[in-house]
Amino acid sequence: MRIASSSGILMDANGKANGSAPSALVAYFLGMGFSREMVFRAIKEIGNDNNNTFPHLLQLLPFLSGDTDSEQILELLLTYQILEEEDEEEDVNWDEDDTVDNFDRATYSDGSGDEDFLQEMSEKDEKIKSLVSMGFPEDEAMRAITRCGLDASVDLLVESIYAPASAGNVYFTNLSDYEDTEFSSFGGRKKTKLIDGTKKKRERYRSRPQWNQVPFDGSHEEPMPLPNPMVGFSLPNDGLRSVHRNLPDHALGPPFFYYENVALAPKGVWTTISRFLYDIYPEFVDSKYFCAAARKRGYIHNLPIENRSPVLPIPPKTISEAFPSTKMWWPSWDPRRQFNCLQTYVASAKHTERIRCALGRFGDALPPAVQKSVLEECRKWNLVWVGKNKVATLEPDEMEFLLGYPRNHTRGVSRKRDIELLGIHSKLIQLHTTSLC
């Protein structure tokens, strides 16, 4: 049996609103000014399993008597409030007349039931918690999951957070957990400067070349500085620098080893890896110097670095060089020359169709707000222009070409697996190993 309370909330015989939460709790938050839809949405995310008795919600009950800090209780609702405001801004960016729906909403709203919804939210929360525990802001974590998909690995999410906002620009996080560290070229003591990530932009690393860094002895967990530009020990045909590094005696010569990971890993990761690999300093490289896609990676190896030579054929370094057919359709307001990091998830057909409809509606008189929104989507999903007002995702064979693999290298497995198999730039590895020939 259900009855209506004085606040107009339906209650069951146990005094629960809509059979899912104590009516007093719901009424309390409604009285604080939150909308009914937002309150029930928060309850739905926490869970509606009657056997669970809502342990999280029950923890909120002491607040009704003033025994608990309000900040902890309101955090979820305030987060929803911020997200709804962001959704409204995105809708305005697309079309002031509300004729074009928000892309993300269309992409991820599939009409699934409550059980699927709760499972999806639980997985999303776990990944957000993992990223936050690494030191990333929660809003960045949520945007990364939106870009890469819920099933993306944490490693891919980390890389996505640090992918440049526009290809060709170097982006650093604004976290105080990451430090600017300057090394003496004579192996002296390091000077570390903490930057307040909430108030200051991260300064670019301007220390001595990375091959003169002092080795890590494992006595600290400070992050390794990243060079700018991120070109590794040498670029092909780079005769301007004389590079030399000293390896421990027990790491000289064969057997050779080669370890690869994302360059912008959380604090302490590279230090720990280096400690277990003879304290060898990583070689940090951004693949944008070798191909048309940015991909920041670090490599710890004991390979010789002298006499490296480029591997032919040299891959194209811009989108127009890689895909000349896109030139005739590329709009002047899209300044991209390179792709962001390649992702294992791509935009859906519905997603690209909505972009086409939005552009077709305005014709040649495209408002700046719509240009900005479309460009953001193109950068997020690495879309290319294949027709008038028409964008498309990169196919696996096109990604193979960008990363230096032969055509059909990954053919025969699922599309998702195709892309996952392209995690390493083959031309870069070939460059690093040419000194062995």
From Swiss-Prot:
Instruction: Name its GO BP terms in alphabetical order.
Output: methylation
DNA-binding keyword on record: yes
| Record key words, sorted | DNA-binding, Methyltransferase, Nucleus, Repeat, S-adenosyl-L-methionine, Transferase
Family of this protein: Belongs to the class I-like SAM-binding methyltransferase superfamily. DRM-methyltransferase family.
Mainly resides where? nucleus
UniProt cross-references to InterPro entries, sorted A to Z: SAM-dependent_MTases_sf (IPR029063), SAM_MeTfrase_DRM (IPR030380), UBA (IPR015940), UBA-like_sf (IPR009060)
Q: Which GO terms describe its cellular component?
A: nucleus
Which residue range or ranges hold the SAM-dependent MTase DRM-type domain?
Answer: 243-437
List where in the cell it is found: Nucleus
Q: Which GO terms describe its molecular function?
A: DNA (cytosine-5-)-methyltransferase activity; DNA binding
Q: Which residues form the UBA domain?
A: 20-60, 120-164
Query: Could you identify this protein by its name?
Result: Probable inactive DNA (cytosine-5)-methyltransferase DRM1B
Coiled coil (residue ranges): none
Summarize the protein's role. Involved in de novo DNA methylation. Involved in RNA-directed DNA methylation (RdDM).
* Top-level division of the source organism's lineage: Eukaryota
